[in-house]
Amino acid sequence: EAQLDRFFMQVDVDYPDLEGERQIIVNTTSTIVPEPVQVMDAKALIEAQGLVRHVPVGESVAEAILELVRAGRPETSDIEDVKKNVSWGPGPRATQALMLGVRARSVIEGRLAPSIDDVLALVHPILRHRMALTFSARAEGVTLRSIIDRLCDRIA
């Protein structure tokens, strides 16, 4: 649990299509070594990281993040599906990751501040590796996706 919690988010990458996989085998098994292209220097990267931390977050977005993460904890949740099916829920790092994630997403999309839509867009990749289902929930076919969707109903 603790090791997984250190990852900012879990991004699932699908298999490449046929042409993409063809490019992979050609590019990675030949003697030609591609030249990397620098897109920004270290200073610009640090400045971008600092910029994200200065993006203002409205109280409604901050409260939605807190509500969502805290409702995912079986010990304190008032959602029956969470109490019954979740063995451990997201900790404070999930709250931090969502806050930074929504700020970064708003910057990337050219907006001055994050919205509830940013929270909803990032909640699955940020929470799914920070929660675990009980054995009985898994046996019954309950999924983390369905539990997280239930959490999203609270703020949507």
For every predicted segment, state its role:
Residues Q10-V82, I108-L112, I116, A137, ...:
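Conserved C-terminal "switch" segment of AAA+ ATPases
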Residues P74-A156:
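C-terminal engagement/docking regions of AAA+ P-loop ATPases
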